[in-house]
Amino acid sequence: MYHFVSEQTPEVRLTDEALVTSHVTQYLKSFQLDAVRFVYDRLAKREFCILNDESGLGKVATVAALLSALPPAKKTLVVLQNDEQLLTGWRFHLDTLTDLQVYIIQGVQDTTDSPHSVYLAKWSQLRSIGDLSRLKFDYIMVDNRGHSLNNSFCTSMLLKQFEGRVNVLISSVDVTSDVRLLYNVLRLGGRLEHQYKSFASFDRKFHLPDPKEVFSKRIDLEEYYKQRGFLSEYIKDFRLRRFRHQFDKSLPLVAPEQYKHNLNLWLASKNSQSTISGSDVCSTIASIDNNPAQQNKTGLFEETDRLSEHSVDDVAMSPLIFEYSESDDEPLTVEPDADQNPVLVVSSDDCEIVTPPSTPQNRTPSLNESPRTKSKKKFSKKTSPRKKADLTDSEEDDEATDNMPPRKRTRAATVHLTPKTRRLNVRILRVSLDTLSTPPPSRTTTAIVTPKTEPTARRKNLKKRTVSPVDVGRPATRGMQRLTRSAETKINSKYLKHRSLDDVKRSFPRRVKLEGNQTPRSSKQIVKQEPKSKVGQEKKQKTVDVPAQGTAKRKPGRPRKCQTKTEDLGKTKTKPNSKHLPPTPQVLSGSSLSSEYMQCAQRIPDNLDAIESPAFRVPFTPQQTPMLLTLPSTHNLLNDSEVVSIPLYKDPVETVVINSSHDECSPQDPSQSRRTKALKRKRKPVTSVNSSFGGGLGLPPAKRSANKSPDLFSISSEHSQIPLAQPRPSSPFEGFKIFGSEVKQFQQQLAKVNISVPKKKRDRSCLDILEQMFEPRQQQSAKTSPKVLPTLPLTQKDDAESTITQRRRTLLEDDFFEITNNGQFGSRMRLNSSGEVSPVQPDQQSVRPSQANKITNYLIGSGITQERTQPSNGNRNSILASLRKSPKSPKQGAKSTQATKLTRWFGSVFGGGASQTSSVESVSAPSTPVNSSTSAAACQTRSARSGGASGPTKRKRLELFK
């Protein structure tokens, strides 16, 4: 019995008079029978109760079983939400499980004088009736499964008509979740105590926080459910609330899809048997036809999905197919035997592919086609050929099916048929007679040949025929009823008219709805083709003629029909579908073929391999890591000025620290000159370790945080302007230049091994000339201070360790640190080791350049003009004071920074060490450090650069610039 499974459950006797027979109990679960007992106990006492089981536990079946136990003379009203699916679900359960007479209240004329036991009514119908005093009911039940009590109109109507009279409330939603809902429910059932007559008093007692506040965690969840517990305790005596997880073994009672199928089968069978009054049938049909998406499971299963339009129609119409085929279509079944080849048929509505093995099967059992057939068959009474061309055309437009052979076979069949069968719709003939032999073309020609002027008139007639069933509705149905003498045709007409119009609309998306029905054009073309074609040539000539004749006056979209016809003429081949598929991928843009740009739910085309993937549309993603790892001049975490390269060997090695005056600078201003860019103070470094030449030597970047020096810089400084960025592959590493040493040559040789060295950059040309001028002094200084020069790595292992320790000692001895403001000119302070802060005069800032350049680095490296004794703190302070008082300061302050640097450099070189003051000015002014003030790296790197262990000579010179 549909999805209800018999379990041989014995009958349940509720009382001496009330008995739930085994016919009903065998289809119910034990927990449903428990609910029947619970509700009946209170119903017998005229007490209010709430059936509040969770959705899916079969509340409607429970109530149906309960109603079957009540005396038949008792009249029960069930008030529903305004939902056709709920109404159908109630009718289904009451009719399937019980023998009760059910009546649907629809208007003022309805009364309770009829011999019915159960009355179903939507609350909107009751509200429209107004005065319900003349309707006498013994029991009143309210179904809140559609949240009807959330509607203020429904609640007010129920309270006005039935306050205190409701016996059973059916609800899937927990009534304790809303205080207002529970208050109204208790009023309907007459269970509200006198002290809570007003909602304000009830709310004060059982107030629940707003769920929004609970979800936003402004209110404790435990407190919220504690309050809900108070409400549950208040109504526990007359409420039954159970949950799905308690009965997992028995659930689901039925699969949602199976329930939908059974519901539609029942609905179709009831309509075909005419067991319900005509008004009920029509209302049911109208509701299904107008609200196909609302055929939802109700009663037992309230959580099912919405039905699709086509599935409803197909399932609901299935019984009608068999009846109808028995009456009129039998003569047709004899014809198809001529050519029995399986034909691939695509239904225009569902786009479902059905492969019927033989024509008789296609005729009767096909759920999709036969209902449509019947409706149209009844409508097309005059000329079957015209209809055939019309309908097949629309279908051809949609799916490119095998339409031409069916057409001819249809005509062949129609020749032998009676006038009654001649009215059959082409669609059913196409499906059923797909495998028929080729028809005689004579009938075809006569039927379809028409001048071009006639199709308009025929279109009008066809419009009238096809549209009238939908518009006129019942009159057409009655006419059809007279023809077929069965109520099923009424349903068929409803469905089929609706669906036929849908087909036409779909087949002509670019035209107006009225034009959609003007399919006779296709008949014109077919007529022209067929007269020309002979019996033997029918298929190929149609293929050739259709495009040739119809091209001139065809609207856009028509050629597609001809092409599909051409392709379809191969009888049993499925090529029409395969040819129909390729256009789909063409819609996809090339870039969409890559997985990165596939849109959601976009189908991958079948001919994906044939489509070229347009690489130019895919944005180029630059490689990030490889260059960072390979090039010695690229930057990782630190830049040149921050790295001390230490060999991995135990032999003492002299560590060379290289600083780029260009590395740490902020993004260059195009208005600045090249020398200004080179000499401008640099910002705090953030770049990488390998940017020093140590990467070329294979030295590790150990102690990177402690090694900062502003005095030396590399030529490949432009890379470091973008810290931690991907290096430009076009700018190779050139190596580092150090004045007064051979490190430059050594590094450049190493760099040339890895990367070809381009010509010297133009922005350093002036400094390079000066470097070449004083090359002999560099060599001489190299001899005097051999520690600066790097030897081969194997011979330098121990020197590196001693150099590092030397630097650490100088850090403790160093007293002065300089604090600058974010790498800009001005805002400097001096901080000594004791914590004393002394400001620097602003005019001093103009005197001192922001950072040492190559010229001063060369001077420092040569060591010719430097003092041989390390000054004490007091000596350093006096030097600074003398520098501030120097008569050169204001003059040089007035000059530009570049002129000052060059002038001081030449003065220091050619003036020699004439006086300590001039020496200090020439050296200290241009080499005011930036990084040295920030960390211990300053003194360490200076000591290393000046020779490390060579003595205080170098250290004194470097520490003047703190």
From Swiss-Prot:
Residues 527-543 have a biased composition (Basic and acidic residues). Its main location: nucleus. It holds the Pfam family SNF2-rel_dom. The keyword Phosphoprotein applies. GO terms for biological process: chromatin organization; chromosome organization; DNA endoreduplication; DNA replication; heterochromatin formation; maintenance of protein location; negative regulation of DNA replication; negative regulation of DNA-templated DNA replication. Residues 360-369, 516-526, 825-856, 863-880, 915-944 have a biased composition (Polar residues). The modification Phosphothreonine is found at T438, T466, T810. Residues 373-386, 552-563, 674-685, 953-962 have a biased composition (Basic residues). Interacts (via SNF2-like region) with Rif1. This is Protein suppressor of underreplication. It comes from Drosophila melanogaster. The gene is SuUR.
